[in-house]
């Protein structure tokens, strides 16, 4: 908005009747300059932003970098491969992906269920304008530089693939698929991809006996038991010397229990016991919706509860 010009004194409200030519020109220049500055400020700046839109693969890289970090396991795949008796069942692996202190760099560590490190890789992401994709360079701590892969966006997921003529470590990924809940890892070593599921961390406690309903009865609590929901187990020894455990499994069913029925995914809690000879026994299980953030079971002689957010810090609700 251009400021109004006001003249104070006895002539306030109207212009003087006599202004010399020089003064008039100077006044017009001043007014013109002021108007020009005001118009420049008020004009929309859309023209300044033209040409600043990023490439789609640059935005894709940001989403990929947000999705990658997490702890993954293919326990679901390994279990159902065995149950279905597939010719070449996948072994069970864990995969930890952590963001590095360096921008756009991630550390990916694949381990066995016993914790033995299979591979540790450094994944570095770049915008690749030539291929119109996100390039991910892979450096293995043992095998060195591996085949890079290029990420592109699909329906509700990202897919990555290496060049067909690149032949490096057969265990390094040459194809990857990344979604909200899963990461699939394909390599030359295996005909089928390793189907990792993203895990969620839970904390549990177990009460013996399983006092419920607020009854005032003595019990012993075993708490601060940590595990994730992709087939992990946590163990404790009770005061009688029994080795007891809890297992969480967020089951993603690839098959149905029987024909004509759709078996729905579930979050399952198991109560198990380990004996001196190494054998185990399942005492019972309970299940709920797969997206649930807490689950419990009461066997009367034992009560167990697992949760992502403790009731000590959760927000009270009506």
Give residue spans per PLM region:
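Intrinsically disordered, low-complexity Ser/Thr/Pro-rich tracts
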Residues: 12, 16, 82, 86-87
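Boundary at the C-terminal end of the N-terminal hydrophobic targeting segment
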Residues: 47-51
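Short secondary-structure subsegments characteristic of cysteine-rich extracellular domains
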Residues: 87-101
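N-terminal secretory signal peptides that target proteins for export/translocation
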Residues: 1-27
């Amino acid at each position: 908005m251009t400021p109004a010009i006001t003249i104070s004194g006895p002539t306030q409200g109207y212009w003087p009747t006599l202004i010399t030519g020089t003064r008039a020109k100077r006044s017009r220049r001043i007014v013109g300059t002021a108007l020009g500055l005001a118009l420049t400020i008020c004009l929309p700046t859309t023209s300044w932003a033209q040409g600043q839109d990023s490439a789609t693969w640059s935005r894709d890289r940001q989403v990929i970098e947000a999705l990658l970090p997490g702890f993954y396991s293919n326990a679901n795949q390994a279990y159902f491969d065995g149950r279905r008796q597939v010719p070449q069942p996948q072994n069970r692996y864990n995969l930890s992906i952590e963001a590095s202190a360096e921008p756009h760099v991630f550390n990916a560590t694949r381990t066995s269920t016993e914790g033995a490190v299979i591979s540790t890789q450094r994944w570095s992401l770049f915008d690749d304008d030539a291929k119109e994709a996100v390039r991910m360079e892979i450096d293995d701590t043992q095998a060195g530089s591996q085949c890079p892969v290029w990420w592109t966006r699909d329906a509700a997921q990202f897919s990555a693939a290496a060049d067909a003529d690149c032949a490096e470590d057969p265990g390094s990924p040459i194809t990857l698929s990344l979604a909200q809940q899963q990461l699939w890892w394909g390599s030359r070593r295996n005909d089928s991809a390793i189907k990792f599921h993203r895990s969620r961390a839970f904390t549990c406690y177990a009460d013996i006996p399983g006092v419920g309903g607020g009854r005032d009865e003595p019990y012993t609590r075993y708490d601060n038991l940590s595990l994730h929901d992709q087939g992990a187990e946590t163990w404790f020894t009770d005061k009688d010397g029994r080795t007891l455990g809890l297992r969480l499994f967020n089951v993603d069913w690839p098959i149905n229990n029987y024909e004509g029925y759709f078996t729905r995914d579930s979050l399952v809690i198991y109560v198990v016991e380990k004996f001196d000879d190494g054998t185990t026994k399942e005492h019972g299980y309970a299940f709920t919706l797969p997206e649930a953030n807490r689950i419990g079971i009461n066997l009367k002689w034992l009560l167990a509860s697992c949760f992502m957010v403790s009731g000590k810090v959760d927000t009270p609700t009506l």
